Amino acid sequence: MCKIVHLPVRVRVFLCVCCISLACPDQVPGQAQRMELGRRLQRFENAWERAEPAERSACVGPLKTAVSSFFSLRLSEAGRQLDVAWQRARGLDMASEFEQSVVGLQLIAQPVCADTEQQSLKIQLRPFYETVKQPPPDTRLSFRLLDASGACLAETSLPLSAVLSSVDWMTGKLSEGDHRLSVQLQSGADSFVIPDLTISRIAGFSERLAALQKNSEKAAASSALEKAAEAVTTVPPTVGATIRSTATFLKSLSEARSQETDFPALARLELCEDLVAEGAAVTEVLSRRGQSQDLWLTLANGRRTVATRIRCPELTQAPVPVLFVFHGAGGSENMFFEAYGAGRVIQEAEKRGWLVVAPAQGILGLSLGIQEMLVALESCFSIDRNRVMLLGHSMGAAQVMRQMQLHPEIPKAAVALGGGGQIRESDVKTFAATPWFIAAGKEDFGRRGAIQLHQSLLEAGGNSRYKDYEDVEHLVIVQAAIDDTFQFLETTISER
């Protein structure tokens, strides 16, 4: 069994807090804070991608503080430090006075999902963290609702004073779609853009949600009856589980519960409606839908399930390679799609025609292993079992080790970034049969574990490559290592 020797104190504290939060969910920071932190992380990562080496080096200090703040659940302070890093990644010694006065503000909009009959949107700006400077009195906000083509559906301009106390914007009825809310603050010649939000409008939302919930109950009952009778399930377990989880998700949106990220609610509903309507044509539905959107599928094996987010490659007749990506502590199935280089890992895999599967894992690990996930995926996609790859960051790197221990014959390449650990002697030769790429930042608290893993593999005669990245800490290691990671993966699966 994998033996992780030195778990950092900050991670132990985080895991303890997570355990408490399971019992006391109302006593921990809400999903709205997680979502806002993710938006600021994306903004920073986009700037870091374009930054010069000296600018990247200047980001290390605030990033370390941001990670420490995150693990101690001081999310507002983590956001402040990410914004300091964002400023430095842009080569600014000091942001403009206007930016300093508004950068700490958070946009709240409700309802993010409603019927097309809904004619208003409640909007508010409130501090995500406090700033020393205050916005000028003449600050105004421009709001625009844009459809998928970029066409403007509604727009307005309001004084900041009104939005700080919450205001109902009468948008009128909006067409059906997953729209974008674009916001810009302005004072004289100074302006500041807030990251967009998704605003979904669905025709007949209540009726369609009720129908989905009814189908969810039918799928659950059908699965239970057929299992009891040892019959062949007519509803694939993954389809039934996906319908149930989507119905739960949409119900939470209808109740105005905060989510951890932007979700295309209409697209997720329509996927499930297609799965219900087209019955056994699961592969066709997913292939068609997967060409224009990510797929949130709940993979199932018996009663055990795992939430995943999946990116499909372009349609092809040949079976496709599969890349499993495992997020770090505090993340979710959305992490690799929206962070870790603002989603660049997913983009690079898509370029190469690989199916990307990002499973959610909690503090107790994965509820399904890669073998069980592959079985579930084979009912939905044509996959190439001879080209299965694993990539993990931090806690996800430990998950790569765990999957290698459980199913050493499956992965053809393994990547561990910002994590690892010492492995028992009895497991080393099993691990060593697969090529590895292991990396960490010179300023990364996970570096020690990564080096331990690499050295264990080398001592067993394994094929392991290790790389340190200068001026890189724990948060940015995936983004820093993307090019080397994909060169390794592409070369390895082409040789095997």
Where are these regions (language model features)?
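Amphipathic, heptad-repeat alpha-helical segments
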Residues: V28-L63, Q100-P111, Q118, I202-T246
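Long, contiguous interaction/targeting segments characteristic
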Residues: Q31-E99, L323, L391, H474
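A domain-start/cap signature at the N-terminus of enzymes
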Residues: I108, V163-D168, G172-V320
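Contiguous beta-strand segments within globular domains
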Residues: P111-P135
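The feature captures the conserved acid-bearing segment of alpha/beta-hydrolase catalytic domains
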Residues: A413-F486
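Glycine-rich nucleophile elbow surrounding the catalytic serine of serine-hydrolase chemistry
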Residues: G392-R402
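Gly/Ser-rich "nucleophile elbow"/oxyanion-hole loop immediately N-terminal to the catalytic nucleophile
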Residues: Q317-A318, G365-S394, P408-I410
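Short substrate-entry loop that stabilizes the transition state in hydrolases
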Residues: L315-V320, V325-L364, G446
